[in-house]
Amino acid sequence: MVQAKIAPSLLAGDFANLEKEVGRMLKYGSDWLHVDVMDAQFVPNLTIGPIVVKAMRNHYTKEEAFFDCHLMVIEPERYIDQLADAGASLFCFHYEATEKHEEIISRAHEKGMLVGCALKPKTPVEVILPFVEKLDMVLVMTVEPGKGGQSFMPECLPKVEFLRKKYPTLNVEVDGGLSLKTVDAAADAGANVIVAGTAVFHAQSPEEVISGLRNSVMKAQETKPWFK
């Protein structure tokens, strides 16, 4: 059975103190750290890149911190070597941003990273079927990518359910609008990796939120037949 993974999104953290934010989330029990890399072309916003990932990695070993790097950039293949050298744990590219899907998967694996493919809300899940079994994770966006703090889109969850039923050992991640109010729907559909930004970083007790998100996934794993 796939494991529940909670990945606080550093996009909602204090960018002037990212090293401390990583440590804070690890202390509160996060499994992964979700790192949003945006180029102001594939999405409107501009965030951080390999240099910042490397700066964070200098403070935490790969055993201490798992950096789940979500690339919202055009031609993500340009960043494989840079992010691998920076210490990224997982390289997640957008299906819509490239035509070199299988090349990216192969090259990123060769560089020692796990590989994921992300789908925008309007992108059908069927497009990844030719290479999905080569992936370590599929990210189903539950908001339009590029901006934090948006509302959860439950209409994206049939893609999660399809993937969980067809590929029971695949990591299925959801990102966008996840909170203690919305996580049950995502977990029940089959998501095991939960990205949450605002809900965690802006909470009075981030530790309780992380625990609650994980408990939701674990409860679904106990009760839903497609997790068996």
UniProtKB/Swiss-Prot annotation:
Q: Which GO terms describe its molecular function?
A: D-ribulose-phosphate 3-epimerase activity; metal ion binding
InterPro entries in the cross-refs: Aldolase_TIM, Ribul_P_3_epim, Ribul_P_3_epim-like, RibuloseP-bd_barrel
UniProt KW Metal-binding keyword: yes
What parts of the sequence cross the membrane? Answer: none
Query: Where, by residue number, is the active site?
Result: D36, D175
Q: Which reaction does it catalyse?
A: D-ribulose 5-phosphate = D-xylulose 5-phosphate
Name of this chain's protein: Ribulose-phosphate 3-epimerase
Q: Which organism is it from?
A: Schizosaccharomyces pombe (strain 972 / ATCC 24843)
Q: What is the lineage of its organism?
A: Eukaryota, Fungi, Dikarya, Ascomycota, Taphrinomycotina
